[in-house]
Each structure stands twice: as C-alpha cells, then as structure tokens.
C-alpha cells in the first residue's frame, strides 16, 4: 500500500462528498488509489450515510491518505460537504470530485504536471469522458465537458450550456482562499456553474489543457424523470434562485450585456420544467423573477406562457410548449451540433 510521508503536506487534496451508494463510492475510491501519482489526500465527506455504508468504506482508511469526515453542520447537501472539505484540505492544489464517477490512473499526475508548468494560472480545465456501465467512453455525443469549444465561457454558463464542471479542473488552493470562494448551499442545481462563475468573476486565471480525457462522468440510464425532479417545489425554487443569482452577478460586472444569454438559460429551464403542461403558479414565479432583472425579457416570457396556454387547447402539450420557442430551440440544436463537431478527444 502506498502512503505519503506523514511529515509532509499532500500536494493535492481531493474533496468528495458522498451519501450511501457504497459500491459506487468504493469504485471511485479504488480509481483514486490506482493513480500513479501518490502525493494526495482524499477528504471523503459523509453527508449522513447509513452505518452499513460507513462500515463498508471504513477499510479504505487503512491508507492514511484516505480520510472520512462526518458532516455535523447544516444544511445537508453536497455544497455543505464541499465547504467542510475546503476547511480541512491541506493540499497545494484542490480537485472536487463526485463519489460515483471515475478517475483514470494518470488523472491526478497529469493535472499537477500541467498546472505546475503554468505558474500564471489559478486553475486549469481538463477534458472529460462519460462512464457508462463501468466503461470509459471519450467519444460520447453529449455530457462531455472541458474542451475549449465555446467562444465565451461566461456566455455558455449563462445559457446553462456548461463549458466545464468543477471536476474538470484543478485549482490552486491559495487562489480559492484569496478570492474567498465558497459553495452556495441554497443551490440544488447548477452548483458547479455557480462556483466556476464565481471564480471567473473573482479574476481567477485559467486555461484549457489539450490532453486525453482523464475523468469519467458516470451516466445512469434508469434515473427518474428529469422534468418531475426539476419541477418539484424545492428544486424549482432553487433553479429560480440560480437564475436570479446569475442575473445579479453578471449585471454587477457587465451591465445588461449577458441578459439575453441568461434568458436563454431560463428558456432551457422552462422547456424542462413544463414538459407535462404549464403550472400557472410556477410560470408566474418565473416571469416575475425575470422581470425583476430585465423587463424586456420578462415580457417576452409572459407572452410565451400566454401563447402556450392558448395552444394547449388545440395542440399536444409538448407542441404547445415548444412552438412559441422555436427560434431558441433551433439555435440550441445548432450550437449542440457545432460543439460536437469541435470536440475531438485526443487518443
């Protein structure tokens, strides 16, 4: 078993919230242990897992680099766990990873090598692959991140078309501390986007590494309906909060230059939330939120909702929802195809 010298601080801190799913968490830890670069610590932050899960994972702590830390603060959630992990992290560099994903054996070492060559940067972005049925697939048509294919990354985040995720990156710990970045525990969605937008707005410098994908984002094909999850009251409120926060943050830095793109992100949310028809109260809440930040785009959204509700009397709900937003949907599909063509994973 490989262990770092106890007198030395680790080069890299990996911060990983987890909640049950013991087998998948174990597989993720196994992939970290299999890395050829050895100078790291894993801070596995328990978000209230069962006794059985903790017992199953306990043997990993025989390696002194693996530390299981119990969350004792509120609220429950991955953001609280990540903030706790940041408080405990001792590494010069930080990586935020998810507990059900996969790291290639070269992942940590490659990231350290690249960022140490770029002393002018605060974080670096690396390409990812998907991980389906325990198979690493870098050529998937979607859910691929970390490629330099967007003309403007902030525009991509505003549209909810994410250029990269936090697990795509390696960060200098000092830069995060200096900028006083934290995870917003009010968010149930777009946590990664919020953190990375905060980092960019705070002036953290970054660049893309043009290397082979090193991180596997696990895809599940048997999950519940996204529209049902995103439209439940708690998640819906969180998504509205995320959009409102984007409006506020971008407008503080750029005035109204990004309003159009944040509105397109709202339309993306709208298209997912109202799959089964318009919920009048949720639609009103969405319109009110947009109008608070842009009366122009709030009025457009109000018109769109009214048009959809009229069309629902004559057409299937999906057609009624999408017909008034055809220009947006066509532009979205065009962007998706363009990005897919630009992404060419390195062997």
What does each model-found stretch correspond to?
Residues 2, 275-347:
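Membrane-interface aromatic/basic loop that binds lipid-linked glycans or pyrophosphate carriers
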Residues 72-89:
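Glycine-rich, basic loop-to-helix element that forms the pyrophosphate-binding segment
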